[in-house]
Structure formats: structure tokens, C-alpha cells
Amino acid sequence: MAKLETLKAALEKVLGKRVQKLIEATGELTLIVKADDYLEVARTLRDDPSLRFEQLIDLCGVDYSDFGDGAWDGLRFAAVSHLLSVTHNWRLRLRVFAPDDDFPVVPSLIDVWNSVNWFEREAFDFYGIVFEGHPDLRRLLTDYGFVGHPFRKDFPVSGYVEMRYDPEQKRVIYQPVTIEPREITPRVIREENYGGTQH
């Protein structure tokens, strides 16, 4: 725990007012910054000798629209980076919220850590978060003509289109989803001696 306290003090000293929030939970530290400060903070985290986060291990998108059983009233989309300082043996989670829920845009970190390239593409593909300044921001895992962003909470579980092989056309075709939603009621069997106990 002393290591986390040392890191927390170093972050507060070096970043000052650019720290929007610093959360310590379950033995981990999360730094939240504003989108306007995101790129500058990332460079500082990498270059400052007292921090030296040389590696970005992962970046993912998050949709907070139903977070906390729908009680969330903050911004909807966030990009969350996981950083590693080999020099100091520290780990840090860096979170930035996109200021616009309708068109989420945050700066790209590709000029700071080039390992973020495909991680940002994945977050764009699945959540629709645009990383401004990314040299090749295109879909990574979904199909070329895919409509929407499948990890958003408002995306239908069954999707919008399905593909199947058409024997008449002898090729794979796309068509609107034909899955009919149905209600499944579980069958409950009651036993007199449930669990082997006598009443």
C-alpha cells in the first residue's frame, strides 16, 4: 500500500489541477482527467522521471449508460488505458470521458504510445468512440458493412442483420434479422423433501 501512496503523491504533485479525480480501490489507482488535458497528461505520465509510464498495456472503451442499475448521471462513454512503469514497477488506470454522448471524441494516444493503435481501433469499432488524430481509424473486428457499434448498451442483442447461405443464389447473403423474441418461463418443480430435510 505504501507504493500506491507514493504513486498517488507523485501524480498529485506532477499533474496538479489536471487531476480531475484520483480513485484508490482494491489495491489499484485510477486517474480521471478531462478530454482537454488527456494528451498532455499522457505525455507527462510517460516522460516525467518521477512517473515514467513507459508502456501502455491496454485501452478499452466503456459505455456507462446503465452503470449502477441506471443511476449513473455522468458522461456516457470513456476510454480507459492501463499503463505500466517498468522503472518504478507501478501500474495505473487512466480514464477519460468523451464530452459529447452523441458523438464521442477523445484525442488519440498514438503519438505517445504506438502500442495503442489497434486498441483504439477496437474501441472505435465496438463503442463508436472517435480517437482524433489516429492515422487509420477504421473497423477492426466487425464486418465491412456492419451498422452500429455492438458493445453499446442500446445495441440490440440480436443485431440488425443476419447472414446466411442462399442455395438459389449460391452465395452468402445479408437480410434483416428474422429472430422472433419469445418469453421463456422456467418450470419449477416443488418437492416435499427438498434438500433431504423433513418438515
Curated annotation (Swiss-Prot):
Per its UniProt record, what Pfam families does this chain match? Complex1_30kDa
GO molecular function terms here? NADH dehydrogenase (ubiquinone) activity; NADH:ubiquinone reductase (non-electrogenic) activity; quinone binding
This chain belongs to the protein called: NADH-quinone oxidoreductase subunit C
HAMAP family cross-referenced by the UniProt entry = NDH1_NuoC
UniProt similarity note: Belongs to the complex I 30 kDa subunit family.
| Enzymatic class | translocase
* Compartments where located: Cell inner membrane
Recorded catalytic activity of this chain's protein:
a quinone + NADH + 5 H(+)(in) = a quinol + NAD(+) + 4 H(+)(out)
How does this chain sit within the bilayer? Peripheral membrane protein
Asked whether the UniProt record includes Membrane among its keywords, one would answer yes
Record PANTHER family: NADH DEHYDROGENASE [UBIQUINONE] IRON-SULFUR PROTEIN 3, MITOCHONDRIAL (PTHR10884:SF14), NADH DEHYDROGENASE UBIQUINONE IRON-SULFUR PROTEIN 3 (PTHR10884)
> Which gene does this sequence derive from?
nuoC
Keyword hit for Nucleotidyltransferase:
no
Q: Which GO terms describe its cellular component?
A: plasma membrane
Superkingdom assignment: Bacteria
Q: What is its EC number?
A: 7.1.1.-
Keywords of this entry: Cell inner membrane, Cell membrane, Membrane, NAD, Quinone, Translocase, Transport, Ubiquinone
The subunit structure is: NDH-1 is composed of 14 different subunits. Subunits NuoB, C, D, E, F, and G constitute the peripheral sector of the complex.
Organism this protein belongs to: Cupriavidus pinatubonensis (strain JMP 134 / LMG 1197) (Cupriavidus necator (strain JMP 134))
